[in-house]
């Protein structure tokens, strides 16, 4: 009882003559939901029809039936009996007869024994009700009374008996307050069913012993009447309180958690029509209840009902707006969730349902019954009972009396569905209207109650046809029908085309699509050709023709052509012109910090940066500055560029970046301070942007806009910052005008070209460290060789050197010296030289960076030259000389040559070595046929400029020049003319134009075969076949399968002629047989595959000795050093600046030895005087390249000794480049980047891990590349064995070999070699492998 308390209350019966007030349970005098009476009272009712006699439980003083009977007569379906807390189920209990009043129904569960039921005839019904109220209030408490059900029955005299029935449905799921047996509950249900069988049944209680098995007690035998006086105190033991959780109406599916709400629902939903009919016919006495809704006549309800025909009806009252929702009839069960028990509140404070028509019961048309009064009764079921089974409801006895007086012939009454049902008690008063707010009203004001306050336009609806699927409105019924048919399966958000399979989620998209089938848009402007899919667009467009708009000023026409100010080429876009302008400039602003390359375009620069990104693992790339990792190279590059952005000024509030600080300050002031600096002069408008202010003035102050616009002119649209300034454009114009090459020679004299004055050093050293620089290769021309052949031979050696491409901007020169006898033989055919013309002639070949070559011949008097005498070379019986000019202090005057003549014999033994040939802007003194001199200046681009003829000595003859590079597009260079007179007379001699493509000097009467053979620079060492390119020569050498046989290196095909194999190899050119086993990369040769494999291993074997950065290619390392760690783009050899070239005069062999010893010792300290003497006593050729060794530790010494001990070459390298070689006479010079020799007589040249040249000894077999295996060098291996050294000891150059071995054995010559030595070599960027030759 304490845990499950139930509130219950009752009101005292009102006295006759007093105004009727509503009770707490919601029932009044005239609205009882269950009235029970015996059959004797029912028989005395006058004027009852046959249908009335069939009722059950009629009152003794009225002809109306009870609520339960009406429900039973209407519904043909059995309702669930689990919901007992219903007002109609009260009459099914046993009857307690009370003297002086009608029998009162008592629930069987309240009686522990039927025999205990007491009947007291003397006790009044009011006293009984008061006594029961007191018992329940004392037992349960007044705060729990509201949850109990009260049933009131009235007498004609006004006395009422109130009986309290505490019920609980079996499906409520709430715990019972006290133990109530299931059999007792079954007895109650059986009694209810028994009472429905006939009107004269008397409710009795049977003894438990007399009940048949399985039958309820109320059906077995009526109980004996109780005649003893009712003990009011004893009733307390007869009461049992049960927790009430839910109440259900049996006439419909309405449910409620409180009894008062259910009773109010039954009174207003099911009993209101009977009261309305009675009041209208008999003039009901008394005023209308204050809490009831005002009764409306049929005439009053008619107009509003017609207006609301299309509303969706609702079948349930809502007593709480916040917690209850519209009831769904399909949900019969509470789905296991128990409703929260609410504490009842006074009716004035209780939330009311929103007024309006019921939402869930279908409304039927009103039928006139008995003078047009009454409506047909509507049940919750779809089928109705026959009219004879439908009964009238009698809310109270007083109402039934009125009905009996005015109309006994009423057949049936209906259920009122007026708007006033469930209205608040104060609905008669004028509703309080809240102050109207702007905007859309709240949801609480969307009901019909507030419709009268809405604004109703007198105009008819523009679109009267409404789609009930999606809510769209249309102008015509045809449009509505087409729209409804287009709905896909009734989906409001999906439309389909009726002529094709098109689907859309927008109605507008479907309309636009439908005109693809029609071919034209439906709406067209009457004054122009404008058409649209929508009529509203045409109406909006028509305003253009109807009103006089003020024309805006014509916008500034956009430029469609952008001419280049330099060359005049026209582009349609500004950015195209900007890109083109970069081609006129030599500036490369984007430089790679890894390899030093520069680029004009940023896009090309970014694409280049992708080559430096290396994979970490599994094709993933990691940022160099943070821990960011991704799988896309471009994404990583963009991320890394954010670390090193070229816009250093970044906003601290947003991602904005800029390259100017004032731009950043302006950005912060406008965007992040909230300031609006642009204010209107005519109003209070202000904005952050100037363009918005202009738009505001033009729209809001149109009359003043013209004047305002004159004071604030519109700025032209800002374009991208120009790439070139006006000054730069003018400079480019001047360069472009002078670009078409040197002008043609004219007959008149040219203005003298002022040379840069020479500044001799203050303290010249004995010999510069780079005295052997310039990559000047010295060859002696034999008597049987022509000048062209000698030049070609020298150039072949030069171009075959791998160091040729490492010099960068440094120019290369090849000087070919001709002896006196050869020179006299060559020049005799042209003219007879004078007696003094015995100076040897020098042929100088200048190779510029662009690839062009220029050959020149000159003669110099050797009297004032610094000389080095060397024995005759092996190529001819005569001696040879290399002559270049020392720095000239002044121009040659007309008085004669500045150098004195020497006997020819001495001149033949003279040699001068210096590095001035490679310096651009240097003046060289070159002689013609006689002893006269002239000056030639080498410019930076490789061209030769001649001084003015006025500055030359009389009788000077121009040398013969010939261009050996590819032909230029511009006009040929012609030399100035000068008259030359023999024997005091002057004559003219003009150098021939450089029209020949052959390399070498154009010699008079030279055979055509010599000039033709010079076109092919490279020759095979096996078959002596010449080739124009090195690549073709290498392909030819790889195909050699013997002296007179060729084989395809990629397949078994072989032939005896090279052209056949070459044609066959062309079939393999498109194939890529070498594939990477880790990705889809494939290459045509193994070299590219090996280079590609480094990207997977992330191996970078080449490191920079300056900054420590590592590279996977040696070429990248060299380019990096040249661009970043050099002065003016040249490689750094020493930390000090290079001193001007000096030439030292050596007139004896002792001075020569001393000078060479000093030079070698200052650089490397490897060769002594005796060893140099031994080396120079033999026939050697010194080949020198520019030296970049800064100290002794950076030098590396490599020794080559063949197995027979006949050939020795001593290579001194630094920075992975050959510095110089001292080799035996007659040995072909191999200058590789990486040089390894095996003791089988194979001289193998290796460049970047790829064999580029193999020299075979006599009688050795030829090997294919597949037969060569690369084995890494281990510290225990020896490149030069002791047996090889012993064999070399018997050769003619043992001293040189010993000297080289003495320096090299610390690195890799003896057994004591340690891993640190190998690491030292690898740190220097030199990788050496032992190459093993296999016989298979």
From Swiss-Prot:
Residues 752-766 have a biased composition (Pro residues). It comes from Rattus norvegicus (Rat). It is found in: Nucleus. GO terms for cellular component: histone methyltransferase complex; nucleus. Component or associated component of some histone methyltransferase complexes may regulate transcription through recruitment of those complexes on gene promoters. Enhances ligand-dependent transcriptional activation by nuclear hormone receptors. Plays an important role in neural progenitor cell proliferation and self-renewal through the regulation of specific genes involved brain development, including REST. Also controls the expression of genes involved in somatic development and regulates, for instance, lymphoblast proliferation. It holds the Pfam family zf-H2C2_5. One of its GO terms (molecular function) is transcription coactivator activity. The modification Phosphoserine is found at residues 975, 1006, 1148. Belongs to the krueppel C2H2-type zinc-finger protein family. The keyword Repeat applies. Residues 300-331 have a biased composition (Acidic residues). Keywords: Activator, Developmental protein, DNA-binding, Isopeptide bond, Metal-binding, Nucleus, Phosphoprotein, Repeat, Transcription, Transcription regulation, Ubl conjugation, Zinc, Zinc-finger. Residues 1-108, 199-222, 282-398, 415-442, 732-766, 961-1013 are annotated as: Disordered. GO terms for biological process: brain development; brain morphogenesis; cerebral cortex neuron differentiation; epigenetic regulation of gene expression; in utero embryonic development; neuron projection morphogenesis; positive regulation of lymphocyte proliferation; positive regulation of neuroblast proliferation. InterPro entries: Zinc_finger/UBP_domain, Znf_C2H2_sf, Znf_C2H2_type. This is Zinc finger protein 335. Disulfide bonds: none annotated. Residues 350-361 have a biased composition (Basic residues). Transmembrane segments: none annotated. There is a cross-link at residue 1021 (Glycyl lysine isopeptide (Lys-Gly) (interchain with G-Cter in SUMO2)). Interacts with NCOA6; may enhance ligand-dependent transcriptional activation by nuclear hormone receptors. Interacts with CNOT6. Interacts with CNOT9; the interaction is direct. Component of a nuclear receptor-mediated transcription complex composed of at least ZNF335, CCAR2 and EMSY; the complex stimulates the transcription of nuclear receptor target genes such as SOX9 and HOXA1. Within the complex interacts with EMSY and interacts (via C-terminus) with CCAR2. Interacts with members of histone H3'Lys4'(H3K4) methyltransferase complexes ASH2L, CXXC1, KMT2A/MLL1, RBBP5, SETD1A and WDR5. Residues 31-45, 54-65, 339-349 have a biased composition (Low complexity). Residues 378-387 have a biased composition (Polar residues). The keyword NADP does not apply. A zinc finger (C2H2-type) spans 247-270, 465-487, 495-517, 523-545, 562-584, 590-612, 621-643, 649-672, 678-701, 1018-1040, 1046-1068, 1074-1096, 1102-1125. Residues 362-373 have a biased composition (Basic and acidic residues).
């Amino acid at each position: 009882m304490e845990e499950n308390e139930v509130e219950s209350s009752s009101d005292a019966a009102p006295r006759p003559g007093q105004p009727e007030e509503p009770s707490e349970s919601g029932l009044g005098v005239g609205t009882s939901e269950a009235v029970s009476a015996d059959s004797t009272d029912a028989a005395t009712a006058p004027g009852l029809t046959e249908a009335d006699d069939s009722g059950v439980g009629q009152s003794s003083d009225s002809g109306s039936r009870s609520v339960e009977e009406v429900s039973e007569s209407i519904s043909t379906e059995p309702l669930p009996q689990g919901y007992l807390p219903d007002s109609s189920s009260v009459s099914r209990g046993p009857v307690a007869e009370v003297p002086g009043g009608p029998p009162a129904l008592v629930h069987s569960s309240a009686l522990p024994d039927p025999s205990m039921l007491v009947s007291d005839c003397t006790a009044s019904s009011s006293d009984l009700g008061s006594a029961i109220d007191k018992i329940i209030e004392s037992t349960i408490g007044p705060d729990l009374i509201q949850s109990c059900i009260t049933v009131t029955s009235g007498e004609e005299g006004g006395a009422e008996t109130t009986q309290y029935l505490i019920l609980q449905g079996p499906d409520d799921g709430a715990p019972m307050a006290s133990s109530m047996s299931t059999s007792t509950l079954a007895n109650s249900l059986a009694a209810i069913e028994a009472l429905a069988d006939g009107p004269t049944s008397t409710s009795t209680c049977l003894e438990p012993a007399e009940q048949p098995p399985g039958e309820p007690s109320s059906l077995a035998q009526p109980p004996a009447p109780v005649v003893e006086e009712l003990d009011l105190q004893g009733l307390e033991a007869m009461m049992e309180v049960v927790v009430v959780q839910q109440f259900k109406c049996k006439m419909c599916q309405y449910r409620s958690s409180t009894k008062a709400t259910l009773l109010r629902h039954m009174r207003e939903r099911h009993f209101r029509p009977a009261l309305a009919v009675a009041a209208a016919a008999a003039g009901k006495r008394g005023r209308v209840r204050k809490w009831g809704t005002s009764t409306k006549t049929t005439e009053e309800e008619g107009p509003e009902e017609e207006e609301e025909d299309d509303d969706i009806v609702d079948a349930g009252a809502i007593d709480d707006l916040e917690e209850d929702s519209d009831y769904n009839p399909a949900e019969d069960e509470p789905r296991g969730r128990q409703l929260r028990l609410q504490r009842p509140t006074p009716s004035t404070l209780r939330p009311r349902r929103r007024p309006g028509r019921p939402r869930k019961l279908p409304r039927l048309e009103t039928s006139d019954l008995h003078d047009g009064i009454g409506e047909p009764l509507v049940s919750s079921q779809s089928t109705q009972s026959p009219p004879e089974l439908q009964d009238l409801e009698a809310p109270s006895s007083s109402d039934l009396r009125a009905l009996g007086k005015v109309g006994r012939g009423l057949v049936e009454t209906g259920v009122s569905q007026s708007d006033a049902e469930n209205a608040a008690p104060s609905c008669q008063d004028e509703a309080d209207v809240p102050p109207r707010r702007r905007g859309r009203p709240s949801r609480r004001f969307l009901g019909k109650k507030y419709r009268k306050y809405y604004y109703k336009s007198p105009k008819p609806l523009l679109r009267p046809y409404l789609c009930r699927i999606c809510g769209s409105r249309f102008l015509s019924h045809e449009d509505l029908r087409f729209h409804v048919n287009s709905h896909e399966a009734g989906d409001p958000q999906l439309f389909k085309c009726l002529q094709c399979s098109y689907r859309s989620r927008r109605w507008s998209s479907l309309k636009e699509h439908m005109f693809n089938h029609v071919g034209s848009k439906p709406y067209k402007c009457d004054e122009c050709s404008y058409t649209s899919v929508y009529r509203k667009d045409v109406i909006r467009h028509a305003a253009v023709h109807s009103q006089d708009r003020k024309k805006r000023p014509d916008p500034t026409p956009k430029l469609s052509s952008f001419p280049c100010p330099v060359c005049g080429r026209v582009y349609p876009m500004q950015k195209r012109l900007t890109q083109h302008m970069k081609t006129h400039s030599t500036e490369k602003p984007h430089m790679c910090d890894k390899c030093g390359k520069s680029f004009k375009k940023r896009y090309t620069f970014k694409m280049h940066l992708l080559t430096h990104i290396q994979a970490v693992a599994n094709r993933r790339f990691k940022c160099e500055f943070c821990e960011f990792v991704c799988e896309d190279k471009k994404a990583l590059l963009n991320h890394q560029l954010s670390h090193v952005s070229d816009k250093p000024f970044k906003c601290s509030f947003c991602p904005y970046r800029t390259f100017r600080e004032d731009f950043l300050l302006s950005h912060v002031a406008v965007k992040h301070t909230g300031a609006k600096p642009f204010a209107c002069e005519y109003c209070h408008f202000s904005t952050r942007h100037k363009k918005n202010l202009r738009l505001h003035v033009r729209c809001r102050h149109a009359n003043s806009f013209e004047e305002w616009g004159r004071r604030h002119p519109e700025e032209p649209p800002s374009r991208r910052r120009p790439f070139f300034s006006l000054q730069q454009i003018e400079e480019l114009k001047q360069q472009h005008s002078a670009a078409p090459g040197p002008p043609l020679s004219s007959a008149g004299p040219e203005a003298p070209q002022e040379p840069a004055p020479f500044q001799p050093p203050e303290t010249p050293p004995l010999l510069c460290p780079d005295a052997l620089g310039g990559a000047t290769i010295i060859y002696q021309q034999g008597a049987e060789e022509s000048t062209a052949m000698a030049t070609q031979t020298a150039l072949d050696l030069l171009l075959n050197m791998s160091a040729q491409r490492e010099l960068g901007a440094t120019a290369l020169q090849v000087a070919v010296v001709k002896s006196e006898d050869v020179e006299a033989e060559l020049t005799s055919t042209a003219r007879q030289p004078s007696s003094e013309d015995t100076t040897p002639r020098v042929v100088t070949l200048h190779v510029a960076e662009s690839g062009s070559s220029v050959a020149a011949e000159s003669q110099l008097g050797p009297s004032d030259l610094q000389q080095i005498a060397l024995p005759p070379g092996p190529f001819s019986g005569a001696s040879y000389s290399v002559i270049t000019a020392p720095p000239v202090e002044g121009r040659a005057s007309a008085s004669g040559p500045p150098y004195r003549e020497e006997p020819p014999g001495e001149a033949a033994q003279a040699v001068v070595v210096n590095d001035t040939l490679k310096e651009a802007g240097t003046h060289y003194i070159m002689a013609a046929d006689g002893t006269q001199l002239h000056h030639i200046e080498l410019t930076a681009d490789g061209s030769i400029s001649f001084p003015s003829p006025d500055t030359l000595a009389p009788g000077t003859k121009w040398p013969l020049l010939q261009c050996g590079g590819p032909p230029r597009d511009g006009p040929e260079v012609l030399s100035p003319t000068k008259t030359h007179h023999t024997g005091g007379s002057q004559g003219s001699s003009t150098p021939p134009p450089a029209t020949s493509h052959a390399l070498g000097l154009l010699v008079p009467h030279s055979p055509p075969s010599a000039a033709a053979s010079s076109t092919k620079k490279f020759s095979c060492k096996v078959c002596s076949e010449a080739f124009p390119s090195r690549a073709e020569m290498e392909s030819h050498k790889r195909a050699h399968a013997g002296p007179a046989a060729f084989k395809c290196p990629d397949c078994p095909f072989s032939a005896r002629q090279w052209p056949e194999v070459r044609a066959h190899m062309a079939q393999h050119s498109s194939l890529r047989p070498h594939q990477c086993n880790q990705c889809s990369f494939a290459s045509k040769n193994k070299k590219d595959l090996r280079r590609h494999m480094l990207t997977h291993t992330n191996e970078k074997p080449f490191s920079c000795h300056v900054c420590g950065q590592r590279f996977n290619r040696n070429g990248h390392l060299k380019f990096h050093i040249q661009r970043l760690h050099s002065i003016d783009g040249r490689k750094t050899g020493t930390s000090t600046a290079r001193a001007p070239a000096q030439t030292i005069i050596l007139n004896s062999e002792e001075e020569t030895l001393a000078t060479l010893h000093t030079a070698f010792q200052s650089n490397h300290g490897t060769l002594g005087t005796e060893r140099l003497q031994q080396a120079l006593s033999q026939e050697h050729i010194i080949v020198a390249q520019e030296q970049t060794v800064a100290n002794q530790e950076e030098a590396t010494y490599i020794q080559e000794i063949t197995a027979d001990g006949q050939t020795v070459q001593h290579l001194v390298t630094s920075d992975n480049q050959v510095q110089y070689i001292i080799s035996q006479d007659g040995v072909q010079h191999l200058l590789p980047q990486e040089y390894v020799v095996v003791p089988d007589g194979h001289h193998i040249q290796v460049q970047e891990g790829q064999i580029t040249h193999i020299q075979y000894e006599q009688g050795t077999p030829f090997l294919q590349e597949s037969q060569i295996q690369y084995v890494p060098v281990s510290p225990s291996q020896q490149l030069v064995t002791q047996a090889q050294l012993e064999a070399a000891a018997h050769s003619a150059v043992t001293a040189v070999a010993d000297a080289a071995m003495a320096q090299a054995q610390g690195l890799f010559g003896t057994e004591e070699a340690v891993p640190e030595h190998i690491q030292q070599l690898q740190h220097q960027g030199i990788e050496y492998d032992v190459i093993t030759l296999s016989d298979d």
